[in-house]
Amino acid sequence: MSWLTEEDIRRWESGTFYDSYRKLGAHPDDEGTWFCVWAPHADGVSVLGAFNDWNPEANPLERYGGGLWAGYVPGARPGHTYKYRIRHGFYQADKTDPYAFAMEPPTGSPIEGLASIITRLDYTWHDDEWMRRRKGPASLYEPVSIYEVHLGSWRHKRPGESFSYREIAEPLADYVQEMGFTHVELLPVMEHPYYGSWGYQVVGYYAPTFRYGSPQDLMYLIDYLHQRGIGVILDWVPSHFAADPQGLVFFDGTTLFEYDDPKMRYHPDWGTYVFDYNKPGVRNFLISNALFWLEKYHVDGLRVDAVASMLYRDYSRKEWTPNIFGGRENLEAIDFIKKFNETVYLHFPEAMTIAEESTAWPGVSAPTYNNGLGFLYKWNMGWMHDTLDYIQRDPIYRKYHHDELTFSLWYAFSEHYVLPLSHDEVVHGKGSLWGKMPGDDWQKAANLRLLFGHMWGHPGKKLLFMGGEFGQHHEWNHDTQLEWHLLDQPYHRGIQLWVCDLNHLYRTNPALWHDGPEGFEWIDFSDRDQSVICYLRKNAGRMLLFVLNFTPVPREHYRVGVPIGGPWHEVLNSDAVAYGGSGMGNFGRVEAVPESWHGRPFHLELTLPPLAALILEPEHG
């Protein structure tokens, strides 16, 4: 009996075997296990493990076309650990299975450390209702508010001990639901030996990290979140892979998964290796991996890490090799990204793909048939950098940098954007969001509430890294839990309540969902002397007015032109006492009088609290 068919080999060789995880890796039956691995340059491959006392001579594999090796091992059962012994000339190494569905923790002996585990992926799902109604591309016209989470440091059950996948399910779902977020985005859960990489230096692309439990435990977490109405996005890292010798690097004694070109194969920023997207086996491996997480784990989307490093051959390099036309664009990576997105949406049209792309590359979220890269969303890194640069300034100097606040609206509709305040902004000495805010504690809290008010008013979906929602003092530390004790203090409870109320307003008001140009209208972006901006969000007959005062100076009788007369309701005020503010405002209601201002036929005369966001709505729209 042959494990691989001629059609399997044809698809593998053509780089279109996008469900290759069904054949490669370890696949147990009642009597033993089929093993299959890609090692085209190997002179010999055998499987060794707990079932043969780690004897590399006991179970040699047979060579097939396309550089594939396969064989059946009687008595190899689920739970057994294993590796592949690869021989190429004088080279010999014991390698972790690239397609392993589970791996042991990154500890153990030099022979058995990081061994793969024969694993069945059986699980009974209970999320049918969620899977039927999840949005995917339809989310462009729905609220999307993402809570970014590192599972190992969100909350600890005791000092230094993280929750398991199963243990964290209920408290995480309770919190996310209470806070009003629509999705959770998990930092990479794929197996990574170096905990301090936060999951971005992957060895086991098909194996959820063993630190928090089994594959079924992770399935339970995702299933539970779905049952609570919460979507799950995974960070996915096809841009580079870990340098651990047991992993993908120099897999068959040659540069197999990585580039052959020494100028291109190594990533100097991260000490990792770069995938060679030209190789059919690499494309099979990565695109299959994306589909694997969407199918087997029911994830709702993939956030693709470090896309800019894939697009440019000279990204963060002093020496690099141009493409065939002499340019800096990585043509094979571009083609891979397009094929990845096309394949995902072909098989999972209700999924989401999101690009962390930090340059001005055009059409990141445009469809491939319009010469785009095909992602559904792109992180708006320009908005993030400009807004954080602005809000960190002493308010007395903000008027000289007013364009940092307003420039993002020139390009806000060029892509389908997510506004990210991610983990990257609260690490490596950058400080926490709270720490970035100028002034004393009162001003820090007010500035942070103001930042969030503008973020939720600005066009684009929302993403906030854990801890930011209550103003954590210290930058994120993956070894400790968040500073939950700060919620004993009024300022931090107030910030948390403000984010909660912003989320609930966002989810219930269609004026905030439509991120096209017709859903946004400037009222005034030119009052740099007083550092005030005001704009409308509108959709489906609803309208919200945002008035933002970026100085600690209260402003009485501040006029704002509006298109509708009559009473306007003060929906939210970040300076409310409940949020830790001074309680200044407009007593919940103000009348728009028929006198032109800002080119509108009516105007409101408002009291602007210091460092505050006001959100108003006409009572009769």
From Swiss-Prot:
It comes from the Bacteria. Its EC number is 2.4.1.18. It catalyses: Transfers a segment of a (1->4)-alpha-D-glucan chain to a primary hydroxy group in a similar glucan chain. GO terms for cellular component: cytosol. The active site is at D305, E356. GO terms for biological process: glycogen biosynthetic process. It holds the Pfam family Alpha-amylase_C. The keyword Oxidoreductase does not apply. Keywords: Carbohydrate metabolism, Glycogen biosynthesis, Glycogen metabolism, Glycosyltransferase, Transferase. GO terms for molecular function: 1,4-alpha-glucan branching enzyme activity; cation binding; hydrolase activity, hydrolyzing O-glycosyl compounds. Monomer. Belongs to the glycosyl hydrolase 13 family. GlgB subfamily. This is 1,4-alpha-glucan branching enzyme GlgB. It comes from Rhodothermus marinus (Rhodothermus obamensis). The lineage of its organism: Bacteria, Pseudomonadati, Rhodothermota, Rhodothermia, Rhodothermales.
